[in-house]
Amino acid sequence: SGIEAAKKWTASNGLPSERVVILAPRFMEKVDAPGAGTLWWNNTELEARGIWRGGADSDPRADPGKHRVVSSFTALDVLIESLLAGKKAGRLPMLSRIALAGHSSGGQIIQRHALFTRIDEAAARLDSTLNVSIRHLPANPSSYCSLDGKRVDAKSGAVATPSASFVARCAGYNSWHFGTDAERWPLPPRCASFPGGTKAAVALFATRTMKYMQGGNDTCACNQERGQYENVRDDPCTCESHGLETTCSDEIGGSYRLMRGRNYWKTLGEVYGGAQPPSHSLSVVPNVGHDHTLLWQSTEGIAAIFGA
């Protein structure tokens, strides 16, 4: 879908398709049967430290000799740094923008990576005058990392701390990767070692170019893939949700993805003093459900990737 979106954009602007370079990293899990020497992540919901979409380190068993690990966030930073280095070396002289786009689980890692990326350090090391803009595009994620413990109240619509009764039955609802607390799960090492801590990360997050994308029809509130996941309800479902996560930490954000995206957007305004950061925007694409192809090839999707 990214390739087709790039083709549409270059064609409409009279440019060769070679003007766009697409990198598509795959974060593998043990079930994917990765080959020797391939990083993989222990993607177990009950052990959040292994989840690649939350910046976890790769499983040390992927490196039997030395047990070295790599954070999924580090992997993305290295990709970005390699592109910047390519421009500095003259291999990518026309590079002007890097867009990190992800849908569903991919959208989750993109939002969280934007919070704890170290790419500013890399850009400063290479050359601060490279003049390459970087943007993050989280699309239709099932959950977000909230920046404080408040959520949108389902009844009043106000942004507030959840009730004591909810907190009692959903211990650690704001722990990583749903929030930045460490009550239930600690922050991954890559995040915990962020210079200046979480407060500094939240402050920098306001300066990121964030383009949140939501399908206007991504409103299925259950999971039709019954019994396949440990983090979803085993309810009958007649609509298309493609793995909607339904833990209490997920559902305090809303019943379905579109609601969760809008609620998260509302909480951003509260975190940053009454208004969302100017470099952040939310687009709802009409007549699109949980479908990456339709979303990225939409007018709104192409504009988010290639527009101003």
Predicted region positions:
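Conserved acidic catalytic loop of the alpha/beta-hydrolase fold
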Residues: 74-96
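Conserved hydrolase catalytic core segment
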Residues: 112-134
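Active-site machinery of serine-nucleophile hydrolases
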Residues: 2-82, 126-128, 134, 138-147, ...
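Gly/Ala-rich beta-loop-alpha elbow adjacent to hydrolase catalytic centers
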Residues: 100-106, 110
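Residue in the alpha/beta-hydrolase core beta-strand immediately N-terminal to the catalytic nucleophile
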Residues: 97-99, 135
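The feature captures the conserved acid-bearing segment of alpha/beta-hydrolase catalytic domains
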Residues: 127-270, 274
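Histidine-bearing beta->alpha loop at or near hydrolase active sites
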Residues: 27-30, 282-292
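Catalytic active-site module of serine/aspartate enzymes centered on a nucleophile-bearing elbow/loop
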Residues: 297-308
